[in-house]
Design a protein with these regions (language model features):
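Short, charged recognition helix plus adjacent turn
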Residues: 63-66
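Short, Lys/Arg-enriched C-terminal cap helix and immediately downstream tail that follows
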Residues: 8, 44-45
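Conserved hydrophobic/aromatic packing and binding residues within compact polymer-binding modules
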Residues: 7, 21-22, 32-35, 61
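Absolute protein N-terminus
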Residues: 1-3
Length: 66
């Protein structure tokens, strides 16, 4: 699984739209969309902010990486 797909899975499990997630971590809907489609790569700090907004963290996110 790639970062974008895994983030999208987490976002949908949290019943959030891209817009709602973007507002939570001060990013645009467009940037969230680009990350989920693997067209953009977030910095570690940005990925951490997104994961915190989804109730997760970097350790858990990469723990069970396939």
């Amino acid at each position: 699984m790639d970062i974008g797909s895994k983030l999208k899975e987490l976002r949908t499990k949290n019943n959030l739209t891209q817009t709602e997630l973007g507002k939570r971590c001060d990013l645009t809907k467009g940037f969230i969309s680009q990350i989920e489609r693997n067209l953009a790569s977030p910095s570690i700090a940005t990925l951490n902010d997104i994961l915190n907004s989804l109730g997760s963290n970097l350790k858990v996110f990469f723990e069970d990486w396939e």
